[in-house]
Amino acid sequence: MLVKIVLVVLLTLALVFECFSTISVPITIGLYISEYNGYRFGVFGWCKVDRSVCSPIRIGYSKDDILLFNEQEYLHLPNHAKYALSNLLLVHVLAFVCVTILWVFGMLTCFRCIKTSRRMLIIAVLWSMLTFMVTLLGFLIDILIFSSHVTWCTWLTLASAFFTVLSGTVLCVMRRNLTYDKFLESKPEKHGVYVPLCRLNDVEELEIPWCNTMNHQALTAPTPM
């Protein structure tokens, strides 16, 4: 039960943190992944700091957008990045989709039919690895385009990647525990019922056959004269 709670919390944090950078300007004025030269940049466009002008909602920046509003002003990207690089911000959308799917996997582990499926857990572990790589790639793209002008939304993307790794580790632990339980169920019973240590309520419930045999031999052995 505790493992499931930890998994759900980690995946929820990863989803929320990735959502902050995805719904940045111009969708949400208060969230932006970079601020430079009087402009705030987001995944789907940019806005001026005074909120008087915003670009259309789309992937990629274009210098033609600002020229439509003011012919004497030119939109410069931080670090002298090329406008074509801004198309790579699509990775943030892909990362959000991947984290959402992984979050759904985490919710499905609450159901017994999914939790006891080793194949489903393997798929979830592999998907968590893919999600981590895509999320980390989104963070690196922000650093590449905006350099030192990134804001806290970009660092939340890195935190989302970190929580994704932790959730993948928890999924691996769940798969290992499931494999161990399957092994105990399929092992032939030679000396009574096998009880997992984690399910014992009292140490006295654990009966070790070879100890009992040695005690019996000690009791029945003849006493030396």
Curated annotation (Swiss-Prot):
Location of the protein in the cell: Cell membrane
Positions in the Cytoplasmic compartment: 1-4, 109-120, 175-225
Residue runs in coiled coils: none
GO cellular component, one term: plasma membrane
Transmembrane segments: 5-25, 88-108, 121-141, 154-174
Mode of membrane association: Multi-pass membrane protein
Extracellular membrane side: 26-87, 142-153
Purpose: Required for the proteolytic cleavage of the transcription factor RIM101 in response to alkaline ambient pH.
Name of protein: pH-response regulator palI/RIM9 homolog 2
